[in-house]
Regions:
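Auxiliary Fe-S-binding modules of radical SAM enzymes
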Residues: 1-89, 241-250, 255-346
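Short linear Ser/Thr-Pro motifs
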Residues: 71, 105-106, 119, 189, ...
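P-loop NTP-binding catalytic core
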Residues: 85-99
Length: 346
């Protein structure tokens, strides 16, 4: 099946030629799909009825909302969407003074196996299509009536493990004729797929790369992240340096603090020594507890002390603001709870 919502304007022009219609119709269809966010050809009122009938051979797929949870604390909303094949994914809308940010999933499940993450429990089911990544943003914008200005690809899945679809998603999201979200308002996370970081750098996109570091050395990183058995910290950091060299975009290092594992003064000193020469920013994240893991989040004082130590060594650092802490806010937890409930009801 042709996924029309994943097609570029040039590909739509080719489709128009195939259907015996004018190429300029491609921009009209593209605008309906990606700017006006329609989900039916019948809504494309400037197209002829005959063209709309022909296009119905190429269904416009749309996510269906299964559940939404709203935080009473800050208005953060966590959405559970069903895909056309019955799989479910989750997305998060976070409201800030500077605008609305949506965190999207890039895969159904994840195969990276990071030990503190709920998303990877159960492994990888499949990669998301560009249209399925886009539609998380489109559905949330349509449901709320509020414009999305920032997008973070930090939900379930490893974005660089879905590389080609990710690039197409970015192209459509940031292009004229659609939502036209600035590349500078886009952040993509990775656990450290080194070859793909180099590939992404060569694209020279103006987005932020967020590297999930979570440890000051290889020994501790291997305990937390299986990917560290394949790529050393030196290799990962060198790839990040290359990304900055090619794009001029400062690297963000995500660092989840686990009590007694990676939150000591020595950890802060060692980490700063590894990244002090880099144009970077460290985002400290108190780890979210999940029942399948024994990890305990660092105390508030330990997090603050770690921040102070890094600042002492000249590192730019912030503590991530916790959004939606009264709902299943941790990545993968709403989907996991839903799947467990569905399984128990069988």
């Amino acid at each position: 099946m042709t996924d029309i919502k994943s097609m570029t304007i040039d590909e739509l022009k080719e489709l128009m030629t195939t259907l015996g219609d004018k190429p300029f119709r491609a921009k009209q269809i593209y605008s309906w799909l990606h700017e006006h966010l329609v989900t039916s050809y019948d809504e494309m009122t400037n197209l002829s009825k005959s063209l709309r009938e022909k296009l119905k051979e190429y269904p416009v797929t749309a996510l269906k909302m299964v559940d939404v949870q709203t935080s009473r604390i800050d208005g953060t909303q966590k959405y559970l969407f069903r895909l056309s094949d019955g799989n479910v994914i989750e997305s998060v809308l976070m409201r800030y003074k500077h605008g609305n940010s949506v965190c999207i999933s890039s895969q159904v499940g994840c195969r990276m196996g990071c030990r503190f993450c709920a998303s990877t429990i159960g492994g990888l089911t499949r990669c998301l299509l560009p249209s399925e990544m886009l539609d998380q943003i489109y559905r949330i914008q349509a449901l709320t009536g509020e414009r999305v200005s920032n997008v973070v690809v930090m939900g379930t899945g490893e974005p660089l493990d879905n590389y080609e679809n990710l690039l197409r998603f970015i192209h459509i999201l940031t292009e004229d004729g659609g939502l036209h979200i600035s590349q500078r308002n886009l952040t993509v996370s990775t656990c450290g797929l080194v070859p793909k970081i180099y590939d992404l750098a060569k694209e020279k996109l103006q987005m932020t790369l967020a590297l999930s570091l979570h440890a000051p050395n290889d020994v501790k990183r291997r305990e937390l992240m299986p990917i560290a058995n394949k790529y050393s910290m030196d290799e990962v950091l060198e790839a990040c340096r290359y990304y900055f060299k090619e794009t001029g975009r400062r690297i963000t290092f995500e660092y989840s603090l686990v009590a007694g594992v990676n939150d000591s003064d020595e950890d802060a000193r060692e980490l700063s020594g590894r990244i002090r020469d880099m144009n970077c920013h460290v985002n400290l994240i108190p780890v979210n507890p999940i029942k399948e893991r024994s990890f305990v989040r660092s105390t508030r004082q330990a997090v603050e002390n770690f921040k102070i130590k890094l600042e002492k060594y000249g590192i730019n650092v912030t503590i991530r603001r916790e959004m939606g802490s009264d709902i299943d806010g941790a990545c993968g937890q709403l989907r996991k709870s839903y799947m467990e409930k569905t399984e128990s009801e069988k």
